[in-house]
Amino acid sequence: IVHRLVGSEMCIRDRYKEVPNFEVHGYDRYLYQFISKEFPDEVDFDFKKMNIMSLDIEVQCENGFPNVLECAEDMLSITVQDYATRKIKVFGTRPYKNTRDDVEYILCDGEEHLLRAFLDYWIQNFPDILTGWNVELYDVPYICGRLERLFGEKEMKMMSPWNIVHDEEIEIKGRKNKVYNMYGINVMDYMDLYKKFTYTNQESYRLDHIAFVELGQRKLDHSEHENFKAFYTNDWQKFIDYNIIDVELVSRLEDKMKLIELAVALAYDAKVNVRDVYYQ
């Protein structure tokens, strides 16, 4: 058992770590010990009552693909979908002709207005689980990075219902990435869930390929444009449709595969946070 010293942050294990042949073993994840003790029986849950949201962003690419470590390019749009209602909300910086009853388009006067409008919506609708394709390594860090860059750390921390957001740099396959832990929200990247629970190797884990393999559907093609910059510059209407379809594809993957539902069931069974199922 790992005991904590009175009046000190140092635990017994730390105190004796320099002593030769004196190993102290124990489990110091006290939260899970508390949960196990207080809830010894099986915990019932209603998946339908969970607030689950899918998110996808689009960013300018004036200087190549946006670098998440720098967050130097302006954001163009943010699209979110509520899994319970299936309603889609789009925050965009240019006019868009909306023809769908399930889509609400919020026209914003530039990026700062877009981020403030999104943050207002976010604070009123904090999700229990946030998902999307590569959302943990791209969408979330880019939103947090731009909020901090434009408005400061205090406003960025409003992404957490507890106003606690920690960031760290991690290395994946030799490449540096930044992740943000928004306390109170479980970010369940659907790409990671797919890799974890499908037990198959794919030639590509791009959303376009996986959606075609699993659903027979693809992302909206924009090959008629010379590059991505030409796409959002010259065809904003289709560009927003492209953003919406990316969110819908992730929802359709969940409808078929129910990987989020599986992760939640495992988490309740093991009495851990949903993100911890990655490590089982």
Where are these regions (language model features)?
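Conserved RNase H-like, two-metal-ion catalytic cores of nucleic-acid enzymes
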Residues: 31-129
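Beta-sheet entry/capping signal
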Residues: 50-52, 120, 128-131, 136-137, ...
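Active-site-proximal helix-loop-helix substrate-binding element of RNase H-like nuclease domains
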Residues: 88-90, 98-105, 140, 149, ...
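Single conserved hydrophobic/aromatic residue that forms the stacking wall/gate
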Residues: 1-7, 12
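Short, flexible loop/turn elements at secondary-structure junctions
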Residues: 57-61, 82-84, 136, 189-194, ...
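Common nucleic-acid-contacting/processivity interface regions adjacent to the catalytic cores
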Residues: 229-280
